[in-house]
Design a protein with these regions (language model features):
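A short, N-terminal "cap"/entry segment at the start of jelly-roll beta-barrel domains
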Residues: 1-36, 43-44, 120-130
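A short beta-loop-beta micro-motif enriched in histidine and acidic residues
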Residues: 27-36, 47-61
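Short, charged/polar surface micro-motifs in flexible loops or helix N-caps
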Residues: 33-35, 43-48, 69, 113-117
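Short, conserved beta-strand element in jelly-roll/cupin
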Residues: 40-43, 55-72, 110
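Structural motif
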Residues: 62, 69-71, 78, 94, ...
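Short beta-strand His + acidic residue motifs that chelate non-heme Fe in jelly-roll/DSBH
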Residues: 72-73, 89, 95-101
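Short acidic-glycine-tyrosine-enriched beta hairpin
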Residues: 76-91
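Double-stranded beta-helix
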Residues: 98-130
Length: 130
C-alpha cells in the first residue's frame, strides 16, 4: 500500500440526507489513521440555530471556513467569521454553527480520529433558541 491517498471530495458520500447542503466525512475514504476530516457545505439559513449544540469528551475541533460567512456560537458567545478564518474549539466547549448569509458556506472540520465515538458527543437541546 502506498504511503499516501488522493481522493476528490465529490467521491465521498454525502451523509446529510434530506438536510440542505452537504456533509462529507472523508476520514475513512482517504484511509486516515490519525486525523478526522469532514467537508461541510451549508446552504443559507441552515445549521444549528434553533436546535441543539454539542461538545466532545476528547476531540478538539478546528474549523476552516473556505467560503461564505457563518455564525459560530461558542458557549454564550456568537462570533461571525468569514472565508479564510480558522477557529479552534476545545473539546468541552459547547458549539454550533449557523449560515445566516445569502449564499452557501463551505468549511473543513479537522480533529483527531476516533475508532469508537459512542460516548464522544454530548448534545444540548435549545442551545441556540431562535
Amino acid at each position: 500500500m502506498a504511503g499516501y491517498s488522493i481522493i476528490h471530495v465529490s467521491d465521498v458520500p454525502d451523509v446529510s440526507g434530506d438536510y440542505p447542503g452537504a456533509i462529507r466525512m472523508a476520514t475513512e475514504h482517504i484511509g486516515a489513521e490519525q486525523v478526522a476530516l469532514t467537508y461541510r457545505r451549508m446552504a443559507p439559513k441552515t445549521g444549528g440555530k434553533g436546535s441543539y449544540g454539542h461538545r466532545h469528551r476528547t476531540q478538539e475541533e478546528t474549523l476552516y471556513l473556505i467560503s461564505g460567512t457563518v455564525e459560530v456560537k461558542l458557549e454564550d458567545e456568537v462570533i461571525e467569521v468569514g472565508a479564510g478564518t480558522i477557529v479552534r474549539i476545545a473539546p468541552a466547549t459547547l458549539r454550533s454553527v449557523w449560515n445566516e448569509g445569502p449564499e452557501d458556506a463551505e468549511m473543513i472540520i479537522v480533529s483527531h480520529r476516533l475508532v469508537d465515538q459512542s460516548n464522544e458527543v454530548e448534545t444540548v437541546d435549545g442551545f441556540w433558541p431562535e
